[in-house]
């Protein structure tokens, strides 16, 4: 069964963070990143922390120049989208080989970050901010 996985040319993974959802395709190549049809540098505004976040799963396995990353991502902001891409790439690498799961799990690339915006409650101005209290 392992040989069947190796022969497949495209590896898919889905990642989520806050309200962002990323569908990631890994294709054997030279390490280029395309996000929504634009280069990864251009889409992420040349922000090194976002770029490092996207490349982290490949760097963990030493495959940063072996696979091209093609992404469709929507929702949220750039930080949420970058972390969603990271999780999607990690899941695609698990599809590539089951042996990749353990190092990716120890680095935390497969974990869904549960933090999201807290809902606003009635009687308050924001999720936790109360109107000014006057004793008299």
From Swiss-Prot:
Biased composition (Basic and acidic residues): 98-116
Matches recorded under InterPro entries: Ribosomal_Su5_D2-typ_SF, Ribosomal_uS9, Ribosomal_uS9_bac/plastid, Ribosomal_uS9_CS, Ribsml_uS5_D2-typ_fold_subgr
Residues covered by region (Disordered): 96-136
A GO BP annotation: translation
Annotated Gene Ontology cellular component terms: cytosolic small ribosomal subunit
One function term, GO molecular function aspect: structural constituent of ribosome
Top-level taxon in the UniProt lineage: Bacteria
Keywords: Ribonucleoprotein, Ribosomal protein
Entry keyword Ribosomal protein: yes
SUPFAM superfamilies reported in the protein's UniProt record: Ribosomal protein S5 domain 2-like (SSF54211)
A Pfam cross-reference name: Ribosomal_S9
Biased composition (Basic residues): 117-136
Annotated family: Belongs to the universal ribosomal protein uS9 family.
Protein name, UniProt field: Small ribosomal subunit protein uS9
Lineage, broadest ranks: Bacteria, Bacillati, Cyanobacteriota, Cyanophyceae, Synechococcales
